Amino acid sequence: VKIESDPAHVEAATTPLHWKQGFAEDFADFPVAYRRVKATVLQEPRRLCWSDGAAACIGLNSKHLERHAHDFESCFAQGQVEYLGQTLAPVASAYAGHQFGVWAGQLGDGRAMLLGDLPSQASAGDWGFDAIDSIHLSDRIEVQLKGSGQTPYSRMGDGRAVLRSSIREFLGSEAMIGLGIPSTRALCLYGSDDPVFRETTETAAIVTRLAPTFLRFGHVEFFAHFHHHDALNHFLQKLAKRHYPKALSARHDASGLNDDDLYKLALFKSIASRTGDLIARWQSVGFCHGVMNTDNMSLIGLTIDYGPFGFLDQYDEDHVCNHSDHQGRYS
């Protein structure tokens, strides 16, 4: 399966991969924010899906894919990145959150890991944003593997993803872009015959996700709840600088707040507005996320973490797409 986009956009993309590990570099002084991890590789992986539109965001096209198929398999099916003679270790980030209205404590990337980030060739529209959104994008794109094995944040899970749900995420996220709904992107999907035990025995898969950032509400909650105040201030400064620079221009006014509090208030308002706009767009196409816990909500207004999502065929305000949501909290 190949998801295609504008051929002119795709053919223009010929840049090789130039990796950085931006998250680890940003939080080098705050090791509590992440852990170095190693992927659980897929045995005899098969590339099942590839999105030309997502690939163009990082300067790749289908010809590039065929020419460097082995290298891409090492990256996206095995989590092994070689760059400038060095092996880059993926990272899993720590966050916390409220799940179904209840404080869940420390969470984190339990079955996902950040390979690193790459130079961006994406426009706002490539993420589903309109020109009127005035979204500010950084010049890097984060690359994340989902289903890549256990991390220190996996709790009791195996860190794997099954093929069935991975196909849903791949198709769902790329479809949302086509509908004009801000979303993470799915670059590619690898499957294998490795068994994964759920209600029944299924097979393992890894989907590669792209985003301007995977930062979520839960990152803020983690730093705040566990009193990592210096890390929190550092985190908010980085977030504002890269994605909400207008918030940093907030200055002293008659409210009595100092400049530091003013920029944080401006940042909060911007995030709330972006989130409200996203949910309105979901409603406009009948999209139901299903698990709107704070660890699944993006700080820049992207649809992230496609789990038991669905679409309404006809309007039903009581529809619950997540069978685990027994009280219908996210109907």
Residue ranges and their predicted role:
Residues 1-28:
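Charged, compositionally biased N-terminal leader segments and the immediate start
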Residues 28-37:
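A short, surface-exposed helix-loop junction/capping segment
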Residues 31-32, 50-54, 319-328:
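Short acidic (Asp/Glu) and glycine-rich catalytic loops that position anionic groups and cofactors
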Residues 39-41:
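Low-complexity, Ser/Thr/Pro/Gly-rich disordered linker/stalk regions
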Residues 44-47, 53-65, 71-255, 259, ...:
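Conserved ATP-binding subdomain of kinase catalytic cores across diverse folds
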Residues 201-204, 284-289, 293-331:
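Catalytic activation segment of kinase domains across protein kinase-like and atypical kinase folds
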Residues 271-282:
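Phosphate/ATP-binding catalytic cores across multiple sugar-kinase/actin-like superfamilies
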